[in-house]
Amino acid sequence: IDCGTVMIPSECDPKSS
């Protein structure tokens, strides 16, 4: 699954925090 597709992208993308 794509990190941007998940409900919590911030959990997959640390830089998104």
UniProtKB/Swiss-Prot annotation:
Negative results: does not affect the viability of U87, IGR-39 and PC12 cell lines at 100 uM after 24, 48 or 72 hours incubation time. Does not inhibit cell adhesion of the human glioblastoma cell line U87 and the melanoma cell line IGR39 to collagen IV or laminin. In vivo, does not show toxicity on mice by intracerebroventricular injection. Belongs to the disintegrin-like family. A motif (D/ECD-tripeptide) lies at residues 11-13. Expressed by the venom gland. Keywords: Cell adhesion impairing toxin, Disulfide bond, Secreted, Toxin. GO terms for cellular component: extracellular region. Venom protein with disintegrin activity. Interacts with both alpha-1/beta-1 (ITGA1/ITGB1) and alpha-v/beta-3 (ITGAV/ITGB3) with a more pronounced effect for alpha-1/beta-1 (ITGA1/ITGB1). Inhibits the cell adhesion of the human glioblastoma cell line U87 and the melanoma cell line IGR39 to fibrinogen and fibronectin. Also inhibits cell adhesion of the rat pheochromocytoma cell line PC12 to type IV collagen. This is RK peptide. It is found in: Secreted. Disulfide bonds join C3-C12. GO terms for molecular function: toxin activity.
